[in-house]
Amino acid sequence: MPLTRRKHFLGCAAALTATAVSLTGAMDAQSASAAGTAGVAGHAAGAAPRPRPADDPDPVADAIADATDAANAAGAGDFDGPGPGDIGDDIGRALEDERAEAADTREKPGAGEERTGAGQLSAARATTGDPRAAGATVYKGRAFDTCHAPSLTTLRAWRSSPYRAVGVYYGGRGRACPNQPYLGPRWMRGARAMGWRVLPVYVGSQSRCVGSAHKKHVPIGARPWTQGKAEGRDAVRRAKAMAMAPRSALYLDMEAYNFRKKGCARTTLAFIRGWSRTVRAHGYLPGFYSSADSGVRHMETARRAGVKDLPAVMWFARWHMGPSVNKERSLAGGAWKPHRRIHQYAGDVTETHGGRRMRIDRNAVDAPVAVIK
């Protein structure tokens, strides 16, 4: 790194460290005040002040956003694979640990809900490690996704294609094609019987700074963490109804957004973390689909800062280039590996196989798929 650039980064790091110290002191003072006041918060009038809820301003996300701003100001916005030790790494880890001690935001299943497989997925909670060790089923090869799940007759015809996996949009209020006349448990089992693997996609609420005009009607609300958890539960319920068992990967679709807007980045990250934590707590693997230069780069920035509860699999869209899960410049070389990446390398193309024509996106896959029961 050039000397002038290094000085700029060191200056940013010093400023962020001071911010972290200030935030930690404030959180300690708040905890001391709550501990010294009689009564339990929320149970009687005059009770102690309640702890900061998960949807209040998040010091972890603030530190990440500040680190991103500093990197962009230094001209580091177009990195080709950031290395260790960048701004915000130690600060993000410290603040995350502090926050975890200050408030337990663990997902707690309600009556009738399951934790099936949650313990079994401990090996797959990080962004590295082979997910098969936790019981996931990994597919490596070509896949297509299309807005409407095709009929089983069309799937049978497409066995002559180079694809052996199909992405389907099975849930979420942001789906462009909410009506799926073929998609259901019978379809899932029929696809499996023909040798197809399934990549289930959940299109929930979208970032407030989403670029697509067609997604602005389903924005993340004022309580992103809580909303993310609620939609995570919905994703799990719908997966079970579609005959997808625990250890299945479920992919959250977050269309391209401007993560350099600090407030928007903070809100979007809180939603994604809430969704991912909840899906993971129920024994499923949380995956994430987005543009390589927006959502995927945002997740990489968060990973470098030591943030927890990130998605376990990364599905990045970068069109007009050859298929490769290993050469994405928005991800560090060792991040989300092994068997944790999907590259969508072409979109809105038309292909015909076995006399059946479909408009699809093309993907190269080395990642977990649905476990169909």
Show the residue positions of the predicted features.
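Secretory targeting and sorting signals
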Residues: 1-35
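Acidic, His- and aromatic-enriched active-site or binding-groove loops in soluble protein domains
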Residues: 220-231, 269-280, 305-327
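Distinct, well-ordered alpha-helical segments
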Residues: 297-305
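Short acidic/polar active-site loop segments enriched in Thr and Asp
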Residues: 164-166, 285
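Substrate-binding cleft of extracellular glycoside hydrolase catalytic domains
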Residues: 135-161, 168-260, 264-269
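Functionally critical loop-and-helix segments that line ligand-binding/catalytic clefts
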Residues: 58, 81-104, 110, 117-146, ...
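Aromatic-lined carbohydrate-recognition surfaces of secreted/lumenal glycan-active proteins
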Residues: 279-298
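C-terminal region of N-terminal signal peptides and the immediate post-cleavage residues
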Residues: 22-67, 84, 116, 123
